[in-house]
Amino acid sequence: MEGLLQFLLAKIILLALASSFVYCYDPSPLQDYCVATNETNGVYVNGEFCKDPKRVTTNDFYTSGLNVPGNTIIGPGARNTVVDVERLPGLNTLGVDIARYDFAPGGLDPPHTHPRGSQIFLVMKGKLFVGFVSSNEYNYTLFTKVLYPGDVFVFPKGLIHFHANIGETNAVVISAGGSQDPGRIIIGDAVFGSKPLIDPKVLAKAFALDYNKVKYLQAVFS
């Protein structure tokens, strides 16, 4: 079983890499690589300055640590460990990302979107209930599935989705996506915890809620 999961993980990463070159949402690079750097005297590409190619090393394309479980004690019982440009500078301009998700029993990654990239899940351990909602063009259709180790599920770019551990043990997922920085908008935080807060009267009317309930939700999320 472990060998099968490793094979599936490798396949997902290869598919994510292949799709990034064909249907990449990030700008297509005009050079082999643009390793991100904090130095500001280089070329600026895709939100980062490029390291001098002559000073690029193997370690610019390497990182470790996805074998370490995330802390699920705080929050809703879910934690993601993201490999981004800060952690892996060689990701810049390549149009891919990878992350580890850890879920405590009953843990939840609340409804959210990734505005700049799609996402694909490979369950390594546990039992997850996942789903996404289509846009108004498709009548806000809800698609859900219960996932087990070895199962793969894809979430289209920009659509609201969620992940919940419905098993009795911890759950682990490896996630890959089609952007080096897909972004993340948690719906509740954005609507009720914006800075500054949205006028409660607007939200009360939009969601058919009592004004005081809106004020309560804003206090919870802000």
From Swiss-Prot:
The record marks 119 as: Probable non-functional manganese-binding site. Residues 64-215 form the Cupin type-1 domain. Pfam families: Cupin_1. The keyword Glycoprotein applies. Residues 1-24 form the signal peptide. This is Germin-like protein subfamily 1 member 4. It is found in: Secreted, Extracellular space, Apoplast. It comes from the Eukaryota.
